[in-house]
């Protein structure tokens, strides 16, 4: 066996430093959030330098005892969902899907109703033709024209000037109404055409 020199002690020193330095490397490890046995939520917290997270899945604290150490990987494993959490998430997902499905159904039903109504309205006018002829209408005078003013200039859209005001016809005869007391009533009931009826 060759004599142990400076080369032989180097690997041994590295192993010793690793074993003794492991707790120091693990020190200052944070405790993640957790739920205790009652289901109460506790926020995560930082441990001071040269201490690390200790305890169980349901209770955590900072310490220097390596036997009580709970690694970050073990802490994340503790975060596995409980049956209550899974049931809550499942019911929330089902409720969300139900709301979305109901909204989509209501939207589609209203669209179908409006489409059918439009089709019915179009089918009623399908065979009818509405003549669209451009018959010019005479302009309506707001005030009677002054006979001293002369003929009015032609209106835009009309070829000829208006011929003047329409003649006024009397709707009722001039003077007091004619009343004849001996005249028969305006409506006479029909007389029976055969006797005894």
UniProtKB/Swiss-Prot annotation:
Name listed for the protein in its UniProt record: Protein shisa-4
Gene Ontology CC, one term: membrane
Membrane topology: Single-pass type I membrane protein
Location in the cell: Membrane
Positions in the Cytoplasmic compartment: 109-197
UniProt cross-references to InterPro entries, sorted A to Z: Shisa (IPR026910), Shisa_N (IPR053891)
Topological domains, Extracellular: 28-87
Keyword hit for Transcription: no
Pfam families named among the record's database cross-references: Shisa_N (PF13908)
